[in-house]
Amino acid sequence: MHYDISFPHLGITLDHVGKSVDLFGVSIAYYGIIIGMAILIGFAIATSEAKRTRQNPEDYLDMGIIGVIAGIAGARIYYVIFSWDMYKDDLLDIFNLREGGLAIYGGVIAAVISIFVLAKVKHLSPFQIFDTIAMALLNGQMLGRWGNFFNREAFGEYTDRLFAMRLPVDAVRSGDITEKMREHMERINGVSYIQVHPTFLYESLWCAVLLIILVLYRKHKKYEGELFLLYLFGYGLGRVWIEGLRTDQLLLPGIGIPVSQLLAGALVIGTGIALLYLGRHHKNSPMHRSVTKYEPMPEKIKGKKPPKWNERLFKNMK
């Protein structure tokens, strides 16, 4: 197998991009490493935002653990349901995450449901929580897509545009290669290559832009839940376009419609209507009242400046 990946029109060539790294004799997939990094950074973002908005960050550690477990399970279940032909003959392969196979929509849906239930149990505002985790979710999606890069998956149809990505045929699943890719296949130094849209890169950059927008807008939000609605609207808008470029779409059985593209379209319409309505009527909504009623910051979160060295010294001398 050949491990090089290149972006010919950008003059970028990476000669050896493996799918895993060996540490102390154990092979660890880059996909898993990236997901782990995304989770840790997401925790940091959510707890930092919780402190900024006078919430208890410990609540987010509890919800984060439940949300991550539910999210990974939901992402896998969603993927398996719409790719059942790949797993029906070997059910144990369902539990093999080393080769990827996580659907972002399934993960977000499962995580949001679990966090909503936990918020109700803890008597917290779910809308405030969703705003707090919106940037953490975007970070996870932005970084997580690079797992697709290492796995040579989630790419689009043939293209010869500026960001075209060139992959060795023997490093790609045969089922992901379309007729159009075969027609434009190149042979370089005895190796066959396909050239495709790097849709993982498009989505990662799209999420990065959305993340910057939310960071800049967060201090100007009008009601709890607005940041989360903007996240859903913006992500859905990008996904409608990007999903149309992909060749490994998860299809609705018997219909052949890309399920993620359908969900993205519904998400854009639904959140768009909600944003327009709440933009006018948020003052009469419980979501508005919760934005002005933060719980007092716990004493250990407020923090107290430690006494200076001379204050400690004189105190001990008294």
Identify the residue ranges that each predicted region occupies.
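A feature for loop-to-transmembrane-helix boundaries and adjacent hydrophobic helices
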Residues: 1-318
